[in-house]
Amino acid sequence: MTYAIIEASGKQLWIEEGRYYDLNHIPVEPGQSIILGKVLLLNKDGHVSLGHPCIEGAVIKATVMRHLRGKKITVFKMKPKKKMRLKKGHRQELTRLMIDSIMT
């Protein structure tokens, strides 16, 4: 089983080939390919490579499937005894990526 741990959108993700992942919005049109270069760990058929902090020459090829919005969260702020109440909603803009290949 081949997998990698990468850093993208301020998060560290465990990724595998052929699966899709939702990241923060990336300004790329759907259908286009992108390359993710910050590979922190790579496991290829039991052989583990660990970067300091990144593995040189290891890249992840991915295709942008679509842009979507995440689940709605509600933010509620209140100050006691002051009748101050603030209720807001937020939906994060996301980009869904399909991992095509993990290359060294």
UniProtKB/Swiss-Prot annotation:
GO cellular component term, pick one: mitochondrial large ribosomal subunit
Keywords: Chloroplast, Plastid, Ribonucleoprotein, Ribosomal protein, RNA-binding, rRNA-binding
Cysteine disulfide links: none
Record has Kinase as a keyword: no
Gene Ontology MF term list: rRNA binding; structural constituent of ribosome
Compartments (UniProt record): Plastid, Chloroplast
GO BP annotations listed: translation
Main location group: plastid
Matches recorded under Pfam families: Ribosomal_L21p
Described purpose of this protein according to its UniProt entry: This protein binds to 23S rRNA.
Entry similarity comment: Belongs to the bacterial ribosomal protein bL21 family.
Assembly description: Part of the 50S ribosomal subunit.
Protein name, as recorded: Large ribosomal subunit protein bL21c
This protein's encoding gene: rpl21
